[in-house]
């Protein structure tokens, strides 16, 4: 009886790219669930608070608006980060078999934290601003759509206008700068940079960058679609939290 090491190795061979895309599919699904489920989660919180008249009680306590808003955002972040924690076993196996370094998992956790903070801040602001849950839900959906889809539509309009004016396929420098600015306002830009960083800036990411005149092989791409977009996302979340606190204090005075 002979031991054939070559046959053994062939029998246990696997395609690392399949595990790589398994990791990306799971992470993309998690990010998508944040934006889809967030309005429903916050709606449930505020519906319960209004039924128990907790909002009126908090409004009567000076300085409680800040504590209430921060507490709500913190609870929502904790709930959605459990989605990331629960997927760690599968994600870890995907990293092991695809050869991805462990820091990619850490980056995914940071991306989920940033996206959750951004979406939760907008949702808390919407439900603090509108007294009717259905109007708050509609406002929340409209604001998120404006930043996620509206910025993409704006870049496409700028691109088409630049091409029609110059008559060339390449965009004017001012058009490229405007497209970069609108891309920074899109919370998915940070995740798109994360996705492109893993896959080598290929596929949809490369196509999008090529259409708006951004070279995905430069350092500008790495800074714009990963670091700067994440910072802008955090700053927008802080701004919406400040607006929610201001709105609750305004309602308390009325």
Model-derived regions, located:
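Hydrophobic alpha-helical transmembrane segments in multi-pass membrane proteins
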Residues: 1, 32, 75-92, 112, ...
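Hydrophobic alpha-helical transmembrane segments of polytopic membrane proteins
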Residues: 107-135, 144-148
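Terminal transmembrane helical anchor/hairpin motif
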Residues: 3-17, 149-239, 243
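Short cytosolic juxtamembrane segments of multi-pass membrane proteins
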Residues: 248-254
